[in-house]
Amino acid sequence: MAQRGVNKVILIGTLGQDPEIRYIPNGGAVGRLSIATNESWRDKQTGQQKEQTEWHKVVLFGKLAEIASEYLRKGSQVYIEGKLKTRKWTDDAGVERYTTEIIVSQGGTMQMIGARRDDSQSSNGWGQSNQPQNHQQYSGGGKPQSNANNEPPMDFDDDIPF
């Protein structure tokens, strides 16, 4: 089946509150995050630095929801890849309501950025694991570059074959 569009959201932001987690009747976990992203600019008329915070509702499912609930806290930085979805419902007063959320399910990603804020543990931010962290650097406009990828540079000094 041909795809007619792309619905992908990428966020790097800060949690505004601890994650909420619920379990639906079939036993699956559903987690909710409130993530803030900030944009700053200089006002051309006044020369003052301005900043605007945008709040995003993120919904996680399954194991990702459980991991977020266990390891993320208010103030944690997180990288999210998901898709936008708008839901519609009727409230108790009979008024139709809408909300737009970022859904992180199959094909989505949730990754902690930085260390865990709990100073009582000397772990690397993911529980008791002593495995080295493989953080990725994100440069504006480029693809993620891994620190663990120590391949030598490609040597293209050969003559062009035509």
From Swiss-Prot:
Transmembrane segments: none annotated. Gene3D superfamilies: Nucleic acid-binding proteins (2.40.50.140). The keyword DNA repair applies. SUPFAM superfamilies: Nucleic acid-binding proteins. It holds the Pfam family SSB. The keyword Nucleotide-binding does not apply. Residues 6-111 form the SSB domain. Residues 116-162 are annotated as: Disordered. Residues 121-134 have a biased composition (Low complexity). Keywords: DNA damage, DNA repair, DNA replication, DNA-binding. GO terms for molecular function: single-stranded DNA binding. GO terms for biological process: DNA repair; DNA replication. GO terms for cellular component: nucleoid. This protein is essential for replication of the chromosomes and its single-stranded DNA phages. It is also involved in DNA recombination and repair. NCBIfam families: PRK09010.1, ssb. This is Single-stranded DNA-binding protein. It comes from Escherichia phage P1 (Bacteriophage P1).
